[in-house]
């Protein structure tokens, strides 16, 4: 059993028999004498994908979820589902279409990922924080645009579109932050 003092971002707890990933924790001190500290959490139910808020009293106990993280690899898209392989056991898992649609723009065949398993079932896939992708379509280079804060839209090899600096051309590899879909630099 865990107490609220153990809560931190990234911890997976069990609420209503579902694994829930803690996204944010805020400890709120009492304003009146005798009141207890409140622990406000924002979490994602890993079975449904819902993001919810819940407030606990300091010292409340919760069960830690039977959640395991494994090194994995993205193999291929099977229709609208993704197929992943556990790098330790070579077991293959399919990810549902709704969850896969969110991370697919960051994945190329063979990309290493982190698989989240709950009761031997795939419930989450974390792509690398930074991926290298090739620009397949973007407007032509704008002359003398190196010192400006302008951006232009670029389409990458996975179909992802994002804003990039105006000096980038088709065929260039760039680094993309998968947490907020942001251009970082040339690869």
UniProtKB/Swiss-Prot annotation:
Q: Name one Pfam family in it.
A: Elong-fact-P_C
Keyword Protein biosynthesis annotated: yes
The cysteines joined by S-S bonds are none
Lineage top rank: taxon? Bacteria
Q: Which pathway does the protein contribute to?
A: Protein biosynthesis; polypeptide chain elongation
What is one cellular component GO term in this UniProt entry?
A: cytoplasm
User: Which InterPro entries does the record match to this protein?
Assistant: Elong-fact-P_C, NA-bd_OB-fold, Rib_uL2_dom2, Transl_elong_fac_P/YeiP, Transl_elong_KOW-like, Transl_elong_P/YeiP_cen, Transl_elong_P/YeiP_CS, Transl_elongation_fac_P
According to its UniProt record, where is this protein mainly located?
cytoplasm
According to its UniProt entry, the protein's GO biological process terms are: peptide biosynthetic process
**Localization terms from the record:** Cytoplasm
Q: Which purpose does this protein serve, as stated in its record?
A: Involved in peptide bond synthesis. Stimulates efficient translation and peptide-bond synthesis on native or reconstituted 70S ribosomes in vitro. Probably functions indirectly by altering the affinity of the ribosome for aminoacyl-tRNA, thus increasing their reactivity as acceptors for peptidyl transferase.
Known HAMAP family for this protein?
A: EF_P
Q: State what protein this is by name.
A: Elongation factor P 1
- What is the species listed in this Swiss-Prot or TrEMBL entry? Geobacter sulfurreducens (strain ATCC 51573 / DSM 12127 / PCA)
Q: In the record, what lineage is assigned to the organism producing the protein? A: Bacteria, Pseudomonadati, Thermodesulfobacteriota, Desulfuromonadia, Geobacterales
